[in-house]
């Protein structure tokens, strides 16, 4: 049986990048959106603008997560780690689709900065993979913990009547917590404090800019 080469994985990464960044009319998912059967809520123009900003940030975060997983899968050493990264990336596609659909419903669109975040995250993921699978998994765990924390903050910022967005974020939060737990069980090591702070600083830059652009 032929094993995939680095070139094969690189071609797959280019394909994944195009699938992530080129917005389809409707993205194919493996799961139904948590908001699918919920009724629309009457929102003011200001509320729509604010919710759109939050969902644009969440969508950008999922673009980063997708890229991080793809970069790590590109350089991971162990087969089961590569498979775990690919599985997590597939779930992030669902998140992308849910965020995109909600943005369109609100009359908005994803961040124009997504290509920048994607490229940076792929590079970070690939470097983490080169540093070793345990460190790579540590990046996954820490990334997912930070994503979970900002999703929790967004849940507090949303109007209580916006049941659709709340349902989406809660399901995403559950998935991210599961990804972090799975990474730790697979042998992730805790990252140094300075690395965590650097990741947090980059995350803040992404969230503050993607909210508006």
Curated annotation (Swiss-Prot):
It catalyses: a 5-methoxy-2-methyl-3-(all-trans-polyprenyl)benzene-1,4-diol + AH2 + O2 = a 3-demethylubiquinol + A + H2O. Fe cation 1 binds at residues 62, 92, 95, 176. Pathway: Cofactor biosynthesis; ubiquinone biosynthesis. Its EC number is 1.14.99.60. Binds 2 iron ions per subunit. Keywords: Cell membrane, Iron, Membrane, Metal-binding, Monooxygenase, Oxidoreductase, Ubiquinone biosynthesis. Belongs to the COQ7 family. Catalyzes the hydroxylation of 2-nonaprenyl-3-methyl-6-methoxy-1,4-benzoquinol during ubiquinone biosynthesis. This is 3-demethoxyubiquinol 3-hydroxylase. The gene is coq7.
């Amino acid at each position: 049986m032929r094993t995939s080469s680095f070139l094969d994985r690189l071609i797959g990464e280019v394909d994944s990048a195009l699938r992530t960044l080129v917005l389809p009319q409707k993205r194919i998912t493996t799961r139904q959106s948590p908001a699918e059967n919920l009724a629309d809520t009457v929102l003011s123009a200001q509320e729509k603008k604010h919710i759109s900003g939050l969902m644009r940030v969440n969508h950008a975060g999922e673009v980063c997560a997708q890229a991080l997983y793809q970069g790590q899968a590109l350089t991971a050493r162990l087969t089961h780690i590569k498979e775990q990264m690919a599985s997590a990336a597939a779930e992030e596609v669902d998140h992308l689709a849910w965020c995109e659909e909600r943005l369109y419903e609100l009359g908005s669109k994803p961040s124009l900065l997504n290509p920048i975040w994607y490229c940076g995250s792929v590079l970070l993921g690939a470097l983490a993979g080169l540093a070793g699978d345990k460190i790579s998994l540590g990046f996954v765990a820490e990334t997912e913990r930070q994503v979970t924390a900002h999703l929790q903050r967004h849940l507090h910022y949303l109007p209580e009547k916006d049941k659709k967005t709340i349902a989406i974020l809660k399901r995403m939060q559950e998935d991210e917590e599961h990804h972090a737990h799975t990474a730790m069980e697979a042998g992730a090591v805790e990252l140094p404090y300075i690395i965590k702070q650097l990741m947090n600083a980059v995350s803040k830059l992404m969230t503050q800019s993607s909210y508006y652009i």
